[in-house]
A protein has these predicted regions:
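Alpha-helical transmembrane segments and their immediate juxtamembrane cytosolic regions
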Residues: 1-242
Length: 242
């Protein structure tokens, strides 16, 4: 954070390119993006051992040890953090000069998305590995959304509907914790030989909404449940902070 702002872009580029090189060099030849043979899993197995890793992924009928966003993925995660820091600096500077941040963020966001989609051909977008192309894609989308929201809320001073997002934003730690608790408990709870989450999808959401829309409906419902808990805290003025 003490680094001059003008160097952050180069630091970000260095981190993302280095992660790409590490993944390619230390993953198994031809399988460096495979769930069983990637460098992220290899390092986690070396550092923590198989018994201390998450066993939520099934390969050939067997649950394997693999932590999504493992220790090595901290590198690109730092880059994600730096992108957020860069946006905050940009918004601050634009506010001081009384300028709109919309066009700048739309331009940068679009550029990052284009780079991500091109890079995806060589280093695929993958959330579980937090790949460099995934970082750029998410940053690009976020830049555009932040630009639009900043323009709508700060420049146009439109506040209708903001409370819905404030409920989650002011208690983001609680929202994350609730989502993890629900996901873990649904995964443990068995109904007719299926996990609770699988049963809900296949018996409620998929029959009503179809395959893809059912998945979307499940995700939206999950978010709304978490929002409901956060809303209770919002009404009580209870906020969890670090």
């Amino acid at each position: 954070l003490q680094t001059p702002a003008k160097w952050l872009t180069w630091i970000n580029a260095g981190i993302l390119l280095s992660f790409w090189g590490i993944m390619y060099a230390f993953g198994d030849a031809g399988l460096w993006m495979d769930i069983s043979h990637n460098a992220v899993r290899k390092l986690d197995l070396f550092l923590f051992g198989e018994s201390h890793l998450y066993h939520g992924n099934v390969v050939n009928g067997v649950r394997i040890a693999f932590d999504p966003e493992g220790f090595l993925s901290t590198l690109p995660a730092i880059s994600t953090c730096l992108f957020g820091y860069q946006v905050s600096l940009y918004l601050e500077n634009q506010a001081k000069e009384n300028k709109s941040a919309l066009l700048g963020l739309l331009g940068w966001g679009s550029t990052l998305i284009i780079i991500a989609l091109i890079w995806d051909q060589a280093f695929p977008v993958n959330k579980k590995l937090w790949t460099s192309s995934f970082v750029l894609l998410c940053a690009g989308i976020d830049f555009i959304l932040i630009g639009l929201l900043n323009w709508w809320i700060e420049t146009k001073e439109r506040h209708f509907g903001n409370t819905f997002f404030l409920v989650l934003g002011t208690n983001s730690i609680l929202a994350y914790g609730i989502s993890e608790i629900i996901a873990i408990q649904l995964g443990k709870y068995q109904i007719q030989g299926q996990s609770g989450s699988d049963w809900l999808y296949w018996h409620i959401f998929e029959p009503i909404f179809g395959k893809y829309n059912g998945s979307l409906a499940y995700a939206i419902t999950f978010v709304l449940v978490c929002w409901g808990v956060c809303w209770v805290f919002w009404r009580k003025k209870w906020f969890l902070k670090v």
